[in-house]
Amino acid sequence: HHKTPRRQRQMCIRDRPYLAGSTNLIFKNTFADIEYILTTCAENGTRFEIECYDIGHLYTLAHFADRGIVKPPFFIQSVFGILGGIGTDPEDVMHMKRTADRLFGDQFHWSVLGAGRHQMRIAAMAAGMGGNVRVGLEDSLWIKPKQLATSNAEQVTQVRKLIEGMGLEIATPDEARGMLKLKGADKVGF
């Protein structure tokens, strides 16, 4: 695995103080906070994308589901390769999927995102396991090793070729909206 030398990281931080904010930031997400967010959003008809950065997040979702605070079907986005979260080994991907299967049965849609250079490899693994994938510049700036992506569209085109090359089909936008029980742009007030 390629690691950025400590000195180079320090230079980036010194040169760009706004990047340094994440090195000592506490991300507060208490059970009371989560319950408030879930309850408030549900009251307003919000559909949740539940991002799970580690196995414990699946158990947190199960806790709130068992209490009736959040209702299935769930859209679970497993996130791989973020510092402090689950890794990018194939065993990690399988463990997240198996745990979600055990906890939620057929009451969830599973999608993945792989951060940084792991994006396409994680997408391929999940697609092969029947999962959905998410790609884009929010998650990775790279299209391939040492080459920056030019756009989200370039990454979507690449993952589409990858998935179709595996003999799998891509959902249409209407199929995806139906799967996720979304209204569609023509039925919202903005």
Predicted regions and their residues:
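C-terminal helical cap(s) of enzyme catalytic domains, especially alpha/beta-barrels
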Residues: 144-168
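Single conserved hydrophobic/aromatic residue that forms the stacking wall/gate
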Residues: 1-13
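Conserved, mostly hydrophobic/aromatic
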Residues: 61, 126, 176
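Glycine-rich phosphate-binding active-site loops on the catalytic face of alpha/beta enzymes
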Residues: 132-145
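Hydrophobic, aromatic-enriched interface-forming segments
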Residues: 37-67, 71-79
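Hydrophobic faces of well-ordered beta-strands that scaffold small-molecule active sites
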Residues: 14, 48-51, 72-78, 108-113, ...
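Active-site glycine-rich loop that binds ribose-phosphate moieties when present
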Residues: 21-41
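Hydrophobic protein-protein interaction segments
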Residues: 58, 72-123
